[in-house]
Structures are given as structure tokens and as C-alpha cells.
Amino acid sequence: MWNGKKKAVTFSYDDGVTQDRRLVEMMNTYGVKGTFNLNSGMQSYANVWEHPKGLLIHRMNTEGLKELYQGHEIAAHCLTHADLPKYDEETIRNEILEDKKNLEGRFGQPVVGMAYPFGTYNDTVVNIARACGIRYSRTIERTGNFGLPEEPLTLKPTCHHNDADVMDLIDRFLASDSEEPQLFYLWGHSYEFDVDQNWDRMEEILKKLSGHDEIFYGTNREVLFGE
């Protein structure tokens, strides 16, 4: 399935916030790869919001991001992080297509993936995403298992990094001897590690998941489509 391997690991992180710098460094250190879902219409350090726990969350400026995310995948997260089902079809199309075009121009790579802002979507949103050239899009509905998605445009992750059972799921994944392809798909927001003061949790996750010869480590696009 993946260069002859039956297991794969991938990561998906949203919003292009300053904490991505530390996360990317950690991922590179452990030899894993992921996909970063960006809002091109909001990609500025001046774009800041206050988390309910009091931390100020900043997106990064666009300068230097191509170098930062080198070796990882860039995917769309909509132009302005719009809650897509609340809008008309023209607005939905603009949110997706303009974000896709902007990101392709900035990063010099095709953008075929997306993560739905707020995790919200409906049939109209899915159909428009497909028409815009999006081949997969992540939701926030966890599966708690390792099967490949039947419909990539409503892709459900294995779990979030803060889920209580994440370590147990990793152990199950590593121990699995299934003949079927097994995918461990983790998602989140890197600012959550500052909010929850638990960067050590991600360190432990990466230590457990990395360095296994029988596992393919790839971006979302690589594990889904082999490209």
C-alpha cells in the first residue's frame, strides 16, 4: 500500500498559528510528516484572537512560511475560516477556490486537500469543494479506528491529540497485525499545546509513533493517494 508497508501515520493541524513553528521542528526531529491547513485571507500576525483560557493566539505572517513548512503539505482551510454551511453557494465557492489559488501561488505546490473550518459541512459544501478541485477534506468527527476513509471529502481522523484514549489508540495501532491497510490520523491546533501547557504530550505521541520501519510517514495527500 505505502511502499509495501501496511501501516501509515499522518498529522493535520489548522490555522497557521505561531505555535506551528515549534510543532514543525518537533515533527522534523522525529521524522514524521503532516498537512497544515491555512486561511490565506487571514495569514498575518496582526490577526489575533483571545482563547477562552486567556491566551492570545496569533497567526503567522506569510513571509518565511514556505521554508517553515518545507517537506510538509499545505492544504486549504478557507479564505476567512468561514462556517461554510451558513453561506450561499457563491460565497462557499469563493472561500474555497480563492484560498486554494492563493496557497498554490504562495507555496508553489498543488493544493488538493482541505479541512472544514469548525468541522462543519453539508452536501452542498462537499459538492462545491469537489468542483473546486479539492480531493479530500478533513472533518473533526473521530473514528477511533485505523480504516481508510470511504469518502475522502468527509475524511474523519482517528482522534485529536487531547483525546483521553490517544495513547491507548497508538498502542492498539502499533500492535495491530491486520492484513488491511491501517492509518493513524491525528489532528489538532498547535496553539492548544500552549493553552493546555502540554507540549510534553505531543512529545510522547511522537516518540511512540515514530521510528518504526514497518510504518510509512507521510502527508495527508501521500497517505491517501500515494503521491
Where are these regions (language model features)?
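Metal-dependent polysaccharide deacetylase catalytic core of the NodB/CE4 family, i.e.
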Residues: 28-125, 131-135, 142-155, 182-193
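Active-site metal-binding loops of divalent metal-dependent hydrolases
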Residues: 13-16, 78, 190, 220
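Non-membrane alpha-helical structural segments and their capping/turn regions in soluble enzymes
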Residues: 89-94, 164-167, 196-199, 203
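Hydrophobic "anchor" residues on beta-strands that sit immediately upstream
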Residues: 10-11, 73, 215
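Short beta->alpha connector loops
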Residues: 15-18, 117-121, 161
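Boundary/entry segment of secreted carbohydrate-active catalytic domains
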Residues: 1-19
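A short acidic, amphipathic alpha-helical/loop segment
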Residues: 22-26, 124-128, 201, 205
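C-terminal domain-boundary segment and adjacent tail
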Residues: 1-2, 29-31, 40, 104, ...
